[in-house]
Amino acid sequence: MSRLDKSKVINSALELLNEVGIEGLTTRKLAQKLGVEQPTLYWHVKNKRALLDALAIEMLDRHHTHFCPLEGESWQDFLRNNAKSFRCALLSHRDGAKVHLGTRPTEKQYETLENQLAFLCQQGFSLENALYALSAVGHFTLGCVLEDQEHQVAKEERETPTTDSMPPLLRQAIELFDHQGAEPAFLFGLELIICGLEKQLKCESGS
């Protein structure tokens, strides 16, 4: 049996997450999957919260590819691309949004967040509004993915409701959403946030 290290623990935990979801993910089940005694895991993850924090970081490291603005990128495009990349990372694993809930920046992420704030401040945002802009986009993205992933679970567990008895506009709206999926609604909301931030920035600058 190969030596157990944190990388192997995290990889196995992500596999288990996809199999059983966040509610079924326990250190006991993870230990069984790894073929070790549960106390052995405590050398690598102290408890489930520590495990979830580690999984959240791993998802971002693997799938979030647009942390910082590219050279010449506008702040609007940066926020768009950052949000899309964050969404992809959350969708990369079952219950990805739930895993990310309640996490806090790690020391490894400090420089990235500092660069994001500095970039927005250079574009004319106050520090306060730069913080709120990043928070608004991040929380919106997280909420959209959380709803999307929960909707998929609920859809599998309940009978598909008939739309025959619904009023016509509601029926068309539901059929449209079911056909298009969640991404168009996410992109629409993201653009509304960015438009609002543009207006706020103009008010701040007096233009």
Curated annotation (Swiss-Prot):
Transmembrane segments: none annotated. The keyword Metal-binding applies. GO terms for biological process: negative regulation of DNA-templated transcription; response to antibiotic. Residues 3-63 form the HTH tetR-type domain. Gene3D superfamilies: Homeodomain-like (1.10.10.60), Tetracycline Repressor, domain 2 (1.10.357.10). Keywords: Antibiotic resistance, DNA-binding, Magnesium, Metal-binding, Repressor, Transcription, Transcription regulation, Transposable element. Tetracycline binds at H64, N82. One of its GO terms (molecular function) is DNA-binding transcription factor activity. Mg(2+) binds at H100. The keyword Metal-binding applies. Residues 26-45 bind DNA. InterPro entries: DNA-bd_HTH_TetR-type_CS, Homeodomain-like_sf, HTH-type_TetR-like_transc_reg, HTH_TetR, Repressor_TetR_C, Tet_transcr_reg_TetR, Tet_transcr_reg_TetR-rel_C_sf. It comes from the Bacteria. TetR is the repressor of the tetracycline resistance element; its N-terminal region forms a helix-turn-helix structure and binds DNA. Binding of tetracycline to TetR reduces the repressor affinity for the tetracycline resistance gene (tetA) promoter operator sites. This is Tetracycline repressor protein class B from transposon Tn10. It comes from Escherichia coli. The gene is tetR.
